[in-house]
């Protein structure tokens, strides 16, 4: 684990991503999260294992380039986003949708 998030692992995970592709990946025990763009794979693994009490077997990360957006005549950039696809060990799961 890197020193950047020492003791603050909850800051690594921003939110789960619920897209059509991410929902299909749930069948294979893979969960997609938006994470801090400075987070390394050991940080992400430690945060997921600590927050959700599961065993992580693999992580794939994607760091797409920032996209330009316009507001009238002003151009700006969207915030940097990093995605992580986390594979869990057999028998582990994360409850993303609370049962009511």
Curated annotation (Swiss-Prot):
GO cellular component: ribonucleoprotein complex; ribosome
GO biological processes: translation
Key words, A-Z: Ribonucleoprotein, Ribosomal protein, RNA-binding, rRNA-binding
Pfam families from the UniProt entry: Ribosomal_L23
Top-level taxon: Bacteria
Quaternary structure (record): Part of the 50S ribosomal subunit. Contacts protein L29, and trigger factor when it is bound to the ribosome.
UniProt-recorded name of the protein: Large ribosomal subunit protein uL23
Gene name tied to this protein: rplW
